[in-house]
Swiss-Prot record:
Na(+) is not transported, but it plays an essential structural role and its presence is essential for fluoride channel function. This is Fluoride-specific ion channel FluC. GO terms for biological process: cellular detoxification of fluoride. Fluoride-specific ion channel. Important for reducing fluoride concentration in the cell, thus reducing its toxicity. It is found in: Cell inner membrane. It comes from the Bacteria. The keyword Transmembrane helix applies. It is a multi-pass membrane protein.
Length: 127
């Protein structure tokens, strides 16, 4: 595959994923408030599920065009999920003295992300 084409697919997918994450964070912030970063958590969990789906489809169907992986996994999921925002929000919880929220958010994000990725793979492999 052409390297330049791969970069364009990743950039396009990343731009779309970033826009979706922003809209999700904006919506959750307006509906539920900002006491817990629901938008970031939801984006990271959904992105983990989607990347599991993409890689499972790629494994299950050998003719799956690798370009889709660049667009969807590296691009969309890479732009949609955000470890840096998760890290900053977690740091802010710690700095503000919200220790239980801090630990809960870390556990929910990490264990939930792995669980959602597993669920995405499991769903494709079993249906």
């Amino acid at each position: 595959m052409n390297f330049s084409k791969s970069l364009l697919l990743i950039a396009f997918g990343g731009a779309i994923g970033s826009i979706f994450r922003y809209l999700l964070q904006y919506w959750f912030g307006n509906v539920l408030g900002y006491s817990l970063p629901w938008g970031t958590l939801t984006a990271n969990l959904l992105g983990s599920f989607l990347i599991g789906v993409v890689y499972a489809i790629s494994d299950r169907f050998p003719l799956f065009d690798p370009q889709w992986k660049f667009l969807l996994a590296s691009g969309f999921c890479g732009g949609f999920t955000t470890f840096s925002t998760f890290s900053y929000e977690t740091f802010q919880m710690l700095k503000s003295g919200h220790y239980i929220l801090f630990l809960g958010y870390i556990c929910l994000s990490v264990v939930g992300g792995i669980g959602f990725a597993f669920a995405g793979v499991w769903m494709i492999k079993n249906f």
